[in-house]
Amino acid sequence: MQKYLEKANVLIEALPYIRKFNSKIILIKYGGSAMENEELKHCVMQDIALLKLVGLKPIIVHGGGKDISAMCEKLGVKSEFKNGLRVSDKATIEVASMVLNHINKNLVHSLQNLGVKAIGLCGKDGALLECVKKDENLAFVGTIQKVNSKILEELLEKDFLPIIAPIGMDENFNTYNINADDAACAIAKALRAEKLAFLTDTAGLYEDFNDKNSLISKISLEQAKILAPKIEGGMHVKLKSCIDACENGVKKVHILDGRVKHSLLLEFFTDEGIGTLVG
C-alpha cells in the first residue's frame, strides 16, 4: 500500500506546478548525452510529451554536433573548430543540414508515437531564423539577427509542438550553421518564454567546478552576473546565455543534467528540483 501512496504523492506534488505553468511556453535545448543514449532519449521524449499533454507549450531546439562530425569523417569532409565553433564551409553546411534534418525527423516521429502533434522545422523555413555571418574565419556560421516568432506562435495556437534544427539564412538566402544554445536563447527571448531549459552533461552550475559540493541549486540574476566572470570554459558561455535570456523576457532558465532520467519532470514538477535555476 505504501508504494501506491508514494505514487499518489508524486502526482499531488506536481499538481500546483502543472496549474502554474499551464499554457506557458517552455523552450528546451536538447543535446549532449540525452541525445546520444537511446534510453535517455526515450525518457526525454516521454517528459516532453507529458509536458505537452498536461497543458504546457514546449518547443525543442536540438543540436547534433557529434553526428555531424561523424558524418563529415565518413564522407571525407574536414572538420575544424575555432573557439569551440565548427568552421562551416559549403561542404560542411551541406553535411550539417542533412544530419540535422535526419535528427529532426526522428524526433518528430518519436513524439508522434507518444501521441503528440509534433512538427519539424529548420531556421530557414519561413525565414524563422534570419542571420548574418558571425566571423569570416568561421565561414557559414551565423549570428541570429531576427526570430520570426509569428510562425511559432501560430503553430502553438494550432496545438503543434515545434522541433527546430539550428540552421538559418541571410538576406541573400545563404545557409548558416547556428550554435544550438544561441538559437534556443534567441527563440526563448523572442517568445518571452516562461522557461528555457538546457539539457547538459553536468549536474548544473558549480561555484567551483572542481568541488562537486559547490553545486548551485538556485541563483538570482544579480548573483549570476557577479559569478559569471569567475566561471571558466563552456559553463561560462552557458551562464552568459542564461543571463541574456533573463534580461530579455525569459522568466527562468534551468541548467539540467540530461544524463539523469526524467530530469525535465524532476526539475519542473517537484519541490526540490535537480539542476540549477537562474532568475
UniProtKB/Swiss-Prot annotation:
Please tell me where substrate binds in this chain: 64-65, 86, 177
Q: Which InterPro entries match?
A: AceGlu_kinase-like_sf, AcgluKinase_fam, ArgB, Asp/Glu/Uridylate_kinase, Glu/AcGlu_kinase, NAGK-C
Question: Sorted alphabetically, which keywords does the UniProt record give?
Answer: Amino-acid biosynthesis, Arginine biosynthesis, ATP-binding, Cytoplasm, Kinase, Nucleotide-binding, Transferase
Listed under GO biological process in this entry are: arginine biosynthetic process via ornithine; L-arginine biosynthetic process
Q: Which compartments does it reside in?
A: Cytoplasm
Pathway given in the UniProt record: Amino-acid biosynthesis; L-arginine biosynthesis; N(2)-acetyl-L-ornithine from L-glutamate: step 2/4
First-level EC class: transferase
Gene Ontology terms for molecular function: acetylglutamate kinase activity; ATP binding
Give EC number(s), comma-separated: 2.7.2.8
What is catalyzed by this enzyme?
N-acetyl-L-glutamate + ATP = N-acetyl-L-glutamyl 5-phosphate + ADP
Task: Give the family, as the similarity comment puts it.
Answer: Belongs to the acetylglutamate kinase family. ArgB subfamily.
What is the recorded function of this protein according to its Swiss-Prot or TrEMBL entry? Answer: Catalyzes the ATP-dependent phosphorylation of N-acetyl-L-glutamate.
Q: Which PANTHER family match?
A: N-ACETYLGLUTAMATE SYNTHASE (PTHR23342), N-ACETYLGLUTAMATE SYNTHASE, MITOCHONDRIAL (PTHR23342:SF0)
Q: What is this protein called?
A: Acetylglutamate kinase
User: Which gene produces this protein?
Assistant: argB
